[in-house]
Regions:
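Well-ordered alpha/beta subsegment
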Residues: 96-114
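Broad hydrophobic/π-residue packing in well-ordered secondary structure
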Residues: 29, 36-39, 58-59, 71, ...
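Catalytic phosphate/metal-binding cores of nucleic-acid and nucleotide-processing enzymes, i.e., regions
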Residues: 1
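Intrinsic-disorder-associated interaction segments
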Residues: 22, 92-95
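Negatively charged, low-complexity tracts enriched in Asp/Glu with abundant Ser/Thr
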Residues: 4-55
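Intrinsically disordered, low-complexity regions enriched in small/polar residues
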Residues: 14-16, 38, 50, 61-64, ...
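Short aromatic-glycine-(Arg/Gly/Cys) micro-motifs in beta-strand/loop hairpins
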Residues: 4-10, 15, 66-92, 108-109
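Amphipathic, interaction-prone secondary-structure segments
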Residues: 45-72
């Protein structure tokens, strides 16, 4: 019986390594939060959330805590690295492998003002 338990533990470790979550790097998150804080100080954005799973990391931006996300920045796992997306109203607005290019596009998107 102990052999079976060891095998289950090893299977768990294998699955854990196989399905590693995607996260924003510290520098990527700092860049996103820099843009976010600028827009919060202007009164355009009010709240954010982070979500991570096995194939993408999502930074969602809200006008209010009670509404749907106004804008989402996705870091998506692709076959040869990662890809960054801007999604607004469930539509892909911009895609790039370079986060700085994606963040420049957030400045061009019309802002939602009260």
């Amino acid at each position: 019986m102990t052999v079976i338990k060891i095998k289950k533990i090893n299977d768990f470790k294998y699955n854990k390594l196989k399905f590693k979550k995607v996260y924003f790097l510290k520098t990527e998150l700092a860049s996103i939060l820099n843009i976010y804080s600028r827009n919060v100080s202007r009164g355009i954005w009010k709240d954010y959330s982070l979500d991570c799973n096995h194939n993408s990391a999502i930074f969602s931006i809200y006008k209010s805590s009670f509404e749907r996300a106004v804008l989402e920045i996705h870091k998506k796992k692709v076959s040869n690295g990662f890809e960054f997306l801007i999604i607004k109203n469930k539509k892909i607005i911009y895609t790039s492998k370079d986060l700085s290019k994606v963040l420049l596009q957030t400045e061009k998107i019309p802002k939602i003002i009260n």
